[in-house]
Amino acid sequence: MKKKIAIIGSGVAGLTFANLIKKNSDFQFMIYEKKESLSLDDGFGIQLAPNSVSILNTIDFHKVNSKDIFHPKSMDFFSIKNEKICDLEISKFNSEYSKYTTLKRSTLIEFLKDEIYTQHLRFGKSIKEVTELKGKVLIKFTDNTNDLVDYVVGADGIFSNTRSFFEKKKSQPLFKKAIAVRLIFKKHNLDINEKNISLFMGSNLHLVIYPINQKNELNLVCIIRDKKYDPDNIKSLIERKLITQNSNLKDLFETDLQSWPLYSTSKVLPSSNNKVFYIGDAFNGFLPTMAQGAGQSIESAYELFNLIKDENLDASNIYFKKRFERTTAVRRRSNFNFFAFHFSSSFTQKIRNFFLKFLVKKKYFINSYLGSVYKN
């Protein structure tokens, strides 16, 4: 009898896992999403390093229209005043078919949903109760439906509701006293190469700009340290924290802005049930300062898929150990970047910039710091 999997959440992690299961196994599966629909509006950009692109290629990512993606070759580092510090060639981590890729998140979701939307995705589904029954997991939903499955895969984000039903130990995400602000634009007065990723570092903030398709659209994300999140006064925050450091940036933010508070996982905890797994941000939520959020969601889905596909009897322990080691390495780099990008004094900024110019030329350091993540 075919084994059955319930996937809770239809983000990048859940959809990637579902595609892997559909294409490469005979497991039955269903995705349960608490929202009423997938959000496919033109959204913000994401970055995919070769490590995640190689996985997506196993489910035909190469079929995505080339006009809807971009392959930046370099990352340019600037002061917040738009003074160039140095650059780093990121295309060195590419292989023939797996290249550093930027695109809209909605483009990725659109691709991932195509093969599973009709038969394998149910909306408006919130868990009400879970029980174990004859070696399986019985999930009861608030709409009075239920499902009896062999495995449950929690892919419902950093504030995972799935965890609250299965885990006694709690690990609340930590507010990092920082805000993310995003927008998409075309026209600007900045001195940048629009084909590259541009990173601007200022006092208690940084700003990243990169192309997301072949239509001259650029994604901008600004990370600003602030003690509280006030969504009604984001433009005031931008004016107070960013524009005072570079008034030339003002025009960029005179449009509709998306914003949210930044959280990260405080402590990574294993599943207490060998039939229940967590992937993506439900396993570990990162700061965006390593651009590995989507990448690690894809990686975690792939790691778990291979263990479940082979029906590994020790899948729970093997998965947690490998994923914990991997996320620890990425989290350390993300946290360090969050620290180094935001130096507030001109003295520490000059020291950082000096070492940055030196380190980007050191092949061993770059392979250790970035290559170990990008090429895994």
Cite the ranges covered by each PLM segment.
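C-terminal auxiliary extensions adjacent to catalytic cores
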Residues: 353-376
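Conserved mid-domain beta->alpha element of the FAD-binding
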Residues: 6-22, 153-154, 209, 256-340
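Conserved N-terminal helical subregion
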Residues: 3-5, 22, 49-166, 171-184, ...
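Conserved N-terminal glycine-rich FAD pyrophosphate-binding loop of Rossmann-like flavoproteins
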Residues: 37-55
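Residues at the starts of beta-strands that form the adenosine-phosphate
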Residues: 4, 28-30, 217
